UniProtKB/Swiss-Prot annotation:
Keywords: NADP, Oxidoreductase, Porphyrin biosynthesis. This is Glutamyl-tRNA reductase. The record marks 97 as: Important for activity. During catalysis, the active site Cys acts as a nucleophile attacking the alpha-carbonyl group of tRNA-bound glutamate with the formation of a thioester intermediate between enzyme and glutamate, and the concomitant release of tRNA(Glu). The thioester intermediate is finally reduced by direct hydride transfer from NADPH, to form the product GSA. The gene is hemA. Its EC number is 1.2.1.70. Possesses an unusual extended V-shaped dimeric structure with each monomer consisting of three distinct domains arranged along a curved 'spinal' alpha-helix. The N-terminal catalytic domain specifically recognizes the glutamate moiety of the substrate. The second domain is the NADPH-binding domain, and the third C-terminal domain is responsible for dimerization. Catalyzes the NADPH-dependent reduction of glutamyl-tRNA(Glu) to glutamate 1-semialdehyde (GSA). Substrate binds at residues 49-52, 107, 112-114, 118. NCBIfam families: hemA (TIGR01035). PANTHER family: GLUTAMYL-TRNA REDUCTASE. The keyword NADP applies.
Length: 419
């Protein structure tokens, strides 16, 4: 029983190679079935995302090259192309790597939480194919508890490191409750969709989506029960907005100083937060000069993100310490299991020898042999049988010039205690 992790990721391989080595839904089941039938593999879990492909296995001794060969053959990629980008971890290093990955310590965005869900899905997919053996079952369950511990004891995922999330975090800091706030979203692209998801997750239920094309805005609005307006209608609705978040591809500003000034008068100068994450700007810079208007640009958000990344790096130090501690503890537990198996096998072998010699001795007694002679012969044979393997091990260690091994065997047999 030996743990093995092989893979490629965004650190080691180009997008082109990662695409070639990915296990899509159409390939995954077949791959797990092949690994289950592989002579060198006891169990396997395959993790395949846009940034990494990794195969975790419980393997027989010396299976490293066989699993690499299998990966090469399965994807029909030459070893000369695959190997330079491939990393291989064994035993405790494999345990530590899986735990680091699951905690977001090896992610493109440090501390991102999505990877844990992807690892859980990979484990679930492998269980569906009955590819997870007892060792991997224990490893993945332990990994999930370690990831939970890292999230609980550190703040590695608590600081915004995406523009969309940073915009929502800023809004939460300025307004006491997003549940009571009305948000105007200008644009309906990917960034605004992410913003809407974060806002919705934080209790915001009053959203207005303004976009050039109504169809795209409707698609977004349906997800969050939002109102849809055109860009031309923004002046009529701006006064309703406590928060404005804008991200379009417009070459010219959409929201001007005069428009905001009018809206603030209608709001009786209740504060308005405007977050402009478009390049070029959607909101005129002069809006920031108005009292009660708080304008933040993508550059302002980037400084927040940079600061948060540094904070995550600090939190990662503690997370790494937790992973080191937990991976070492799991490896110790795994080794203790291996010792239990060895002890069981050794005891079984000794019992088989005893039963065999006892049967022969009883037959001799039944045939009328001298009991004393039978007992002496039994004790001699039992001694010779039981010391044969240790004696041979001592001889080999001495012949091969391995004093350290010789010392270990002597200690195991308790010979030094007899002096």
């Amino acid at each position: 029983m030996s743990l093995l992790a092989i893979g490629i990721n965004h650190h080691t391989a180009s997008v082109d190679l990662r695409e070639k080595v990915a296990f899509g839904p159409d390939k995954l089941a077949n791959a797990l079935q092949q690994l289950s039938q592989h002579e060198a593999v006891n169990g396997s879990v395959i993790l395949s995302t846009c940034n990494r492909t990794e195969v975790y296995c419980d393997v027989k001794s010396g299976a490293r090259s066989k699993v690499i060969d299998w990966l090469s053959q399965f994807h029909q990629i030459g070893l000369e192309e695959l190997k330079p980008s491939l990393y291989v971890y064994e035993e405790q290093a494999a345990i530590r790597h899986l735990m680091r990955v699951s905690c977001g310590l090896d992610s493109l965005v440090l501390g991102e939480p999505q990877i844990l869900g992807q690892v859980k899905q990979a484990y679930s997919d492998s269980r569906e194919q009955q590819a997870v053996d007892a060792s991997l079952e224990k490893l993945f369950q332990k990994t999930f508890s370690v990831a939970k511990r890292v999230r609980t004891e550190t703040d590695i995922g608590g600081n915004a490191v995406s523009v969309a999330y940073a915009a929502c975090t800023l809004a939460k800091h300025i307004f006491e409750s997003l549940e009571k706030s009305t948000v105007l979203l200008v644009g309906a692209g990917e960034t605004i969709e992410l913003v809407a998801k974060h806002l919705h997750a934080n209790g915001c239920s009053k959203m207005i989506v303004a976009n050039r094309t109504r169809e795209r805005a409707l698609t977004l609005a349906e997800q969050f029960d939002a109102q849809v307006i055109s860009l031309q209608e923004i002046p009529n609705h701006l006064a309703k907005a406590d928060i404005v978040i804008s991200s379009t591809a417009s070459p010219l500003p959409i929201i001007g100083k005069g428009m905001v000034e009018t809206a603030l008068k209608q709001r009786r100068h209740q504060p308005m937060l405007l977050v402009d994450i478009a390049v070029p700007r959607d909101v005129e810079a002069q809006v920031g000069d108005l009292n009660d208007a708080y304008l933040y640009t993508v550059d302002d958000l980037q400084s927040i993100i940079d600061s948060n990344i540094e904070q995550r790096k600090v939190e990662a130090i503690q997370a790494e310490a937790i992973v080191a501690e937990e991976s070492a503890a799991f490896m110790s537990w795994l080794r203790s299991l291996q010792a239990v198996d060895s002890i069981r096998e050794y005891r079984q072998s000794a019992n088989e020898i005893r039963e065999d010699l006892l049967s022969k001795a009883l037959l001799s007694l039944e045939s009328g042999s001298d009991p004393e002679k039978v007992l002496r012969e039994l004790s001699n044979r039992l001694t010779n049988k039981l010391i044969h393997a240790p004696t041979r091990a001592l001889q080999l260690a001495a012949e091969q010039g391995e004093p350290a091994k010789l010392t270990v065997i002597r200690q195991s047999l308790g010979l030094d205690e007899l002096k």
